[in-house]
Design a protein with these regions (language model features):
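Extended, charged catalytic domains and RNA/DNA-binding interfaces, predominantly
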Residues: 6-7, 12-437
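Short, aromatic- and glycine-rich surface loops/edge beta-strands on solvent-exposed regions
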Residues: 2-4
Length: 437
């Protein structure tokens, strides 16, 4: 029945087109840490040499965290910076956009801020009228978006934010790709926010006690809105690229891997973590490369080298398996989000789930083809408020002002127009009929 529903919808629904326009030239020029104005080598704690433990240890953290630098995080009221995110992970209280405090009962062991590389820091810079970037015509609608008088969770505020968020990407992409919005100016904002995110990771890294990572999210999708997002995590911060590789460099994940390989040749080690393959419309683990050619040894080696981990659970659903793919598993339907990201279009099941990918990889190996799907698993939050809640009793979801109450998330009856509107907003953002708890 689920397969029939997908086929019927695919035949009858107009699919939103993705953006595959190359805007920025790919580069691997390194940003030396001493060039960063707020980085001081004297403030960094010394490296700690730790013997490999005889027994394995479990460490808990989050490698998928958004702050005020992500365009969607800022649009939904997030003011928390990467510095605030690391304070939260270490056990301090930080403010939710709705005004209440968020705090862990037990600090985390590791944390990585992974703001979207595409338009990194751009909405924040557009809204802040003290910045040079805010002076361009494009920025005017965003002026004062998160000023104190606009930080309510009422109906008008939610409608305004929905309108801002829904129009931002299409308008920003159109103006950037056409050249109407100065590309160098956009790139300048991105590079500045990237340096600040690195500095925050440096400031809070405490070897042997609390580990931070310089990181970001690569946000790509196929033409039919199949999700191909990855979080890119760097091993160190001594030398890093001047700018993160984004879909404005290429929408092809294989080009991301090549960029990572080129940086690796310069001594810069990293890994990419795919997430929400459940919304990839069969593209994340398909048995063909980006061009549609059969998988070969070079593809397998490059994917294994760059993507040793897959995120299989987060707020936008699980990516382990689906009831159609695992009919004898009574838990296969747990936290399923069956839609492509940011649409109401169903996602094809085959090629979208990790357990099936493992089986397909084993089958390839039995055919004498190197298995490209050799990976471990991780769970993350994808919070967009800088705070990763890990207790169901203290959970406020991920979208700031539009998901801060039980009514808005749909876990309590919507007794007012504001709560119902927020729930409809969540559905419009691709959460389908799922209730965010």
């Amino acid at each position: 029945a689920a397969t029939a529903e997908f086929d019927a919808q695919s035949a009858g629904q107009s699919i939103v087109r993705g953006w595959n326009v190359k805007v920025f030239e790919t580069e691997t020029e390194l940003l030396l840490r001493e060039q960063s104005p707020s980085a001081t080598t004297s403030s960094k704690p010394p490296a700690v040499s730790v013997k490999k433990p005889i027994e394995r240890k479990a460490f808990f953290g989050d490698l998928h965290v958004h702050t005020t630098y992500s365009f969607d995080g800022y649009a939904f009221g997030t003011l928390a910076t990467p510095y605030d995110a690391y304070r939260f992970a270490r056990g301090e209280a930080i403010a939710n956009p709705a005004g209440f405090n968020m705090q862990l009962t037990r600090p985390m062991d590791f944390y990585a801020v992974t703001d979207h590389a595409m338009f990194l820091g751009v909405v924040k810079a557009a809204a802040d009228t003290s910045t040079q970037f805010s002076k361009n015509e494009f920025s005017a609608p965003y002026h004062g978006l998160n000023a104190p008088e606009n930080m309510g969770a009422g109906l008008l505020s939610i409608l305004n934010r929905l309108n801002t968020f829904s129009s931002f990407l299409s308008e920003a992409v159109m103006q950037t790709t056409s050249g109407k919005l100065d590309r160098d100016e956009v790139l300048g904002v991105v590079r500045s926010a990237w340096r600040d995110s690195i500095d925050a990771a440096d400031q809070f890294n405490d070897p042997g006690r609390f580990t931070t990572f310089a990181a970001y999210e690569y946000t790509s999708s196929t033409a039919d809105m199949g999700n191909l997002h990855r979080n890119v995590i760097f091993k160190g911060t001594g030398e890093l690229p001047r700018e993160p590789f984004s879909r404005f460099h290429s929408a092809n994940p294989e080009d991301l891997w090549q960029w990572m390989d080129d940086l690796r040749a310069k001594g810069v080690e990293s890994l990419a973590i795919p997430h929400n393959s459940n919304g990839s419309n069969g593209q994340m683990f398909k048995l063909a490369d980006w061009a549609g050619d059969p998988l070969d040894e070079a593809y397998a080696a490059q994917r294994i080298r760059n993507e040793p981990i897959v995120e299989i659970t987060q707020i936008k659903g699980t990516s382990e398996t689906h009831p159609v793919l695992s009919s004898r598993d009574e838990w296969a339907g747990f936290e399923i989000m069956p839609y492509r990201i940011a649409t109401s279009a169903l996602s094809q099941m085959e090629g979208s789930y990790a357990r099936e990918a493992l089986l397909n990889g084993i089958a390839l190996g039995q055919q004498g083809i190197t298995n490209p799907y050799q990976f471990g698993f991780i769970g993350s939050s994808d919070t967009h408020s800088a705070a990763s809640q890990n207790k169901e009793s203290d959970f406020v979801s991920k979208l700031g002002l539009i998901s801060s109450t039980g009514e808005q998330r749909g876990s309590l009856p919507q007794t007012g127009l504001s709560g119902e509107m927020s729930y409809l907003v969540l559905k419009a953002l691709g959460r389908g009929n799922s209730r965010l708890r």
